[in-house]
Amino acid sequence: MPKDDSIEVEGTVMEPLPNAMFRVVLDNGHKVLAHISGKMRMHFIRILPGDKVKVELSPYDLTRGRITYRAK
């Protein structure tokens, strides 16, 4: 999938799940299941409930996403 096809939205982490997955509530009210991107995992960036994050969604499945950025 080309990189420019993904939809980037902001949201808030609600709860951590096993295997580096998180339940994220987007700013528009939708709930998605998101995992951490490889670069964030490589650099040991911690994500806690309540953190504001940027999530990339695929246009094919809008219920799953990838966390690409954690706001400071």
From Swiss-Prot:
Record localization: Cytoplasm
Protein name: Translation initiation factor IF-1
Subunit structure comment from the entry: Component of the 30S ribosomal translation pre-initiation complex which assembles on the 30S ribosome in the order IF-2 and IF-3, IF-1 and N-formylmethionyl-tRNA(fMet); mRNA recruitment can occur at any time during PIC assembly.
UniProt-listed PANTHER family: TRANSLATION INITIATION FACTOR IF-1, CHLOROPLASTIC
GO CC field: cytosol
Keywords, ordered alphabetically: Cytoplasm, Initiation factor, Protein biosynthesis, RNA-binding, rRNA-binding
Signal peptide: none
Function recorded in the entry: One of the essential components for the initiation of protein synthesis. Stabilizes the binding of IF-2 and IF-3 on the 30S subunit to which N-formylmethionyl-tRNA(fMet) subsequently binds. Helps modulate mRNA selection, yielding the 30S pre-initiation complex (PIC). Upon addition of the 50S ribosomal subunit IF-1, IF-2 and IF-3 are released leaving the mature 70S translation initiation complex.
Main subcellular location of this protein, as a coarse class: cytoplasm
SUPFAM superfamilies: Nucleic acid-binding proteins
CDD domains: S1_IF1
Family in the record: Belongs to the IF-1 family.
